[in-house]
């Protein structure tokens, strides 16, 4: 199976209000009979905390059908269940208005059942409102269902006030057991919300699930809809019917009617089969006789058709108004996903590594003068890790690679990762399938020509007009264009003489024989209105596939940008050209104000705390006696108190990202497995507050918001730390401004926090006295890679023009570089260098590699010995 991006916020199971009619387009219904069936097996959940469980003799113990621990995806059948939520009442409701009591109502949102929010009626001016209203949801207990109960104050003249939200994990419920809960919202004021839950079997629905233990893809149906006009048209212009299917990928479409029996125009809707979806259809406005009607047109009432009772393959006809009929047929979608669910490497990368090992083994035998060749399991996986820094990182990486090539370490490397400006070098190199076997001095000379050229012609009207046409085409293909795309066009102009139509997937030609290291480009996925502290996710790109290791979800790189739903490809969009990827990978304009403050100050907690919602776990409040649980892994029940109006306004200003790159989310529609937090792979990358709030994670988002990784930590280590890649030696090439050791120290701290095997930070020197190379290891951790760290500094290069070759007095000036000073020609904002500045930086980078050959060989031998010991004593 493969993987890809798109998304919205719709999900899977439906819900209906037990005491009220349907809201929306209309209430006229045609309801076929419901087929009955038997449930294959039963699934129970636990009781918890401040809950009173009734009828304990009927409780069914937990027996999950799809308890996932493996790294690959699995398929199985699981029944759906009916959940009834009875909102009983509240006591001591907090006062929202100064002059009167709260006009209180409660909304219910369960996104794993439906995107529609349900609400109780409003009870005005009451301290102890009582509703006694019931709502019914159809849920899948193999996914993480968290019900959000929001208490609101209704205002007639202004926007309703959101007082608080209770997040309740439904995995605490026992099957066939009424659970009576009093949520202690404010123990000091004795404010509480009283709710009753009942989970029952649904004997008519059992669906096929595909999961990797973190994400779950549910069964999807396709509804084909034709519209027929029952009388001849008098006009040439067709009037379309407006058709909406709730919780579907398409949501709303216009369907042109035609004459029977030919149906040239049809619409397709894709929806989760067991979400209790509704179809709403509205006929075109009809003209009235002015003698009988005060207006010239008459709006037809919409009609509604529930879809959960349609039989697959059977055509159902629905009258719409007086003159139209809808003919609809439901059919199951394929269970084969286009998103690859799994944490292992894709087959293409596995095959590449096997081919590359042959190249590496031959190179190492010559480098180390080995008497015997290396066995396959003895060949170390060496990776080159480059950081960001604009043109400075691009130019320095050329110099470093030139040095590594001369030492044969380039041919010994299996991976090369980069972010920001380093990706400019990588993308240029991989346009040539044989680049690493050629003398890189030719490529460096060509790069020099472009770095020193004048960039002002890029802003001339004729050039801007061409870019405008390109961006319009990009938008017409289905992409949301931003200033980041313009930035990508400017990078393209700065790196070459003509338009580059290459794609990321085209770089596979440079890997087909294992002739070059595998390039991996890194960004982070963020939220438009949330600080990086609260939410960020690693997102990697390779010529084979793109995806997120935290979820174990990947798609072929040529499908990046296409639209997906529940793991299935809905609409293929042309793969973006490389210039747009370069703009994305170095999207320096996507930073919000709060993240900028965090990067430049150590006292960021002031703004962070002042603008953040208050979270209060009420799991341990001794309001009610504890009840034994059947499930060991429920989320804590949490009360979320919104920020004040002023804080919220301030936060919107601070967290807004006006130029963030948006791409269709290939996880859209999928849901999280009920035990996703216990999954070892997810836990490895679970590093933000929102990871324990499943309704806020990426699978519910329409778009991915991708950002330059340097805004979190200026390194591209994450792809190399995946245990599946088994990297033994990482050559860290640092190009960041400011503290040279900060990215490495941040990575060490991150790995310690996440329990990822990595060396401890052991550099004692300050930035003014750093050495050219450090070798770091962690002898206590067998799986920790060896790290050879190269800060971008000018040390012995000031006196030596080559290792062991001193400079003459006339050459001393060539060894002086102002890399990080206030008037440095290498500042991150600089796109253009002088020829002298370019040459100095390339020679410095090359020299630092060549001058530390012995340390690189030392690091290599350590990595090989560690790998040999690990293979002899597998853990």
Swiss-Prot record:
What does the UniProt keyword field contain?
A: Calcium, Cell membrane, Cytoplasm, Endosome, Hydrolase, Lipid degradation, Lipid metabolism, Lysosome, Membrane, Metal-binding, Phosphoprotein, Transferase
Q: Where in the cell is it found?
A: Cytoplasm, Cytosol; Early endosome membrane; Lysosome membrane; Cell membrane
Activity-regulation annotation:
Stimulated by cytosolic Ca(2+). Stimulated by anionic phospholipids such as phosphatidylserine.
Which InterPro entries does the record associate with it? Answer: Acyl_Trfase/lysoPLipase, C2_cPLA2, C2_dom, C2_domain_sf, cPLA2_C2, LysoPLipase_cat_dom
GO CC annotation: what is one?
Answer: lysosomal membrane
Q: Gene3D superfamilies per the record?
A: C2 domain, Cytosolic phospholipase A2 catalytic domain
The tissues in which it is expressed are: Predominantly expressed in brain, heart, skeletal muscle, testis and thyroid. Expressed in neurons but not astrocytes or microglia. Expressed at lower level in stomach.
The UniProt record lists the EC number as 3.1.1.4
- Residues annotated as coiled-coil are none
Q: What is known of its domains?
A: The N-terminal C2 domain associates with lipid membranes upon calcium binding. It modulates enzyme activity by presenting the active site to its substrate in response to elevations of cytosolic Ca(2+).
Q: What is this protein called?
A: Cytosolic phospholipase A2 epsilon
Q: Which organism is it from?
A: Mus musculus (Mouse)
Classification from the root reads: Eukaryota, Metazoa, Chordata, Craniata, Vertebrata
